[in-house]
Amino acid sequence: MSFQQPKSLNVLLLGDSCLDIYHYGSCNRISPEAPVPVFVEDEIEVRHGMALNVYLNLLAFNLAVECMVGDTQVEKHRYIDFKSKQHLLRVDLNEDEETGVFRFDERTMADVDLVVISDYNKGFLHPPACSSLARYCFDKNIPVFVDSKKKDLSCFENCILKINKNEYEEVVQYPNNYDLIVTVGAEGTLYKGEIY
């Protein structure tokens, strides 16, 4: 199978961001204070998550990407035992803090060929701004690809929606006009009634 590099595009990426922080260590004893393991940290690995991961993937295609994310960065700390590979604990920080809000402005759309939205429903992308963006892009023939955890997707009129099977079952409202791609795990991807 051959892979063709996409032509150079100017991409606007909008979404929520996080840092995925992996704490690797060992648990060799139980705490005398409570019946819990004592974790001794050996190594930390930090990865960009949510929209920042999408940003890195788009850059790998040598695309010109402008990334706009909320002010608050969620941190997801995962504690993993080296020996057993057991995921012991996850601690989320800044999960409920107020984030800046995206406000649609046509001036940010100069030279944009494509919009990608990575919405984890953390408060950065409010429906009215998403509706304005979707309407503008439809009028200008700019494709909008959306991966959203919102249960009401009606603000993404005329967009291409990508959700997973669990999210699909939780959505309460869709736009009037849209394309839908549903990822179904190892089975592949569902599009217009066909599995790919």
Model-identified regions with their sequence ranges:
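Ribokinase/PfkB-type carbohydrate-kinase core domain
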Residues: 1-28, 33-34, 40-196
